[in-house]
């Protein structure tokens, strides 16, 4: 580990090493999934278990079982969505930590898990830890530097403390199948006085494969769920300003990226569910939301 990260390089994991479950939800990505699995098993940290949940694949993913017999394989015959699948992997874990890795994401070195767990063991109120995500649209590595607070982690590469999840709750379902679930969970963790930190330069590569991705559908869902997130968690009277600002921001982005149709459809999906979301509102404390916004601006 680089000497530029004394807060990490000086740490020692306790003799009784915590168990880490690396959870991978997959659907119809049999060609790229092995790279994610291999990168998890290549980690230097000794107490890693790898669990793969096949969410209704029909591309031969199940044939990989014989190649990776050490994996804890589970399969759903019909797809229930990645959010329910991730919740299942976290709820059924007997591990101390859950590491979320996408089926098209992988580690670049061999020490990422060891560094993450050492840091979280040394900082017992850190409930979630974000890796530094690289992707085809952000390919350049950064030097490893001191961990720092952040607003949220991304689903393709992060670690969460199982005890914090059991206290604050798992992913909350939304009308859309994609978007804002990590933001919602991180906000609730912060409201429960857990912290979210980031490891700059400790990278996970997210390949963002186009297989099983529908850009318009993801945008529609993402717009809806972002508005649901605001309605569900934003305290009064701030919600009266946040919702219109978010809608205008989504419209401007959609106009620039030629996604106006799915954006408007996302508004419609949100409006159809707005009453039920309002009735189940559970906003966080004002100071929590203000801190979340401050960290988001600094990210």
Describe each PLM feature range.
Residues 38-47:
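Short, acidic, metal-binding catalytic loop of nucleotide-sugar glycosyltransferases
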Residues 39, 54-63, 105-106:
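A conserved acidic beta->alpha catalytic loop
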Residues 76-93:
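Glycine-rich, basic loop-to-helix element that forms the pyrophosphate-binding segment
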Residues 98:
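Short aromatic/hydrophobic "clamp" motif used to bind/position activated sugar donors
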Residues 221, 236-299:
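Non-catalytic, C-terminal membrane-associated alpha-helical segments of glycosyltransferases
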């Amino acid at each position: 580990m680089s000497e530029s990260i004394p807060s990490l390089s000086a740490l020692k994991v306790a003799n009784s090493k915590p168990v880490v479950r690396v959870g991978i939800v997959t659907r119809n990505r049999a060609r790229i999934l092995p790279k994610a699995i291999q990168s998890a098993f290549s980690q230097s940290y000794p107490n890693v278990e790898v669990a793969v949940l096949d969410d209704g694949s029909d591309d031969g993913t199940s044939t990989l079982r014989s190649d990776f017999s050490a994996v804890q394989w589970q399969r759903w015959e019909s797809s229930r969505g990645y959010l329910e699948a991730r919740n299942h992997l976290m709820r059924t874990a007997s591990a101390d930590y859950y590491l979320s890795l996408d089926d098209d994401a992988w580690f670049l070195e061999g020490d990422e898990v060891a560094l993450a767990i050492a840091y979280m063991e040394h900082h017992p109120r850190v409930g979630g830890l974000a890796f530094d995500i690289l992707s085809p649209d952000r390919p350049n590595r950064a030097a490893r530097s001191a961990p720092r607070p952040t607003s949220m982690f991304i689903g393709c590469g992060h670690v969460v403390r199982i005890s914090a999840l059991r206290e604050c709750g798992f992913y909350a379902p939304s009308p859309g199948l994609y978007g804002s679930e990590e933001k919602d969970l991180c906000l609730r963790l912060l409201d429960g006085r857990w912290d979210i930190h980031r490891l700059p330069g400790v990278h996970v590569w997210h390949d963002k494969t186009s297989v099983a991705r529908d850009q318009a559908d993801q945008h529609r869902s993402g717009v809806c769920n972002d508005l649901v997130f605001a309605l569900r968690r934003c305290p009064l009277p701030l919600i009266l300003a946040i919702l219109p600002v978010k809608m205008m921001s989504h419209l401007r982005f959609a106009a620039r990226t030629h996604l106006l149709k799915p954006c408007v459809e996302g508004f419609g999906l949100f409006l159809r569910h707005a009453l039920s979301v309002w009735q189940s509102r559970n906003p966080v404390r004002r100071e929590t939301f203000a801190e979340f916004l401050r960290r988001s601006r600094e990210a």
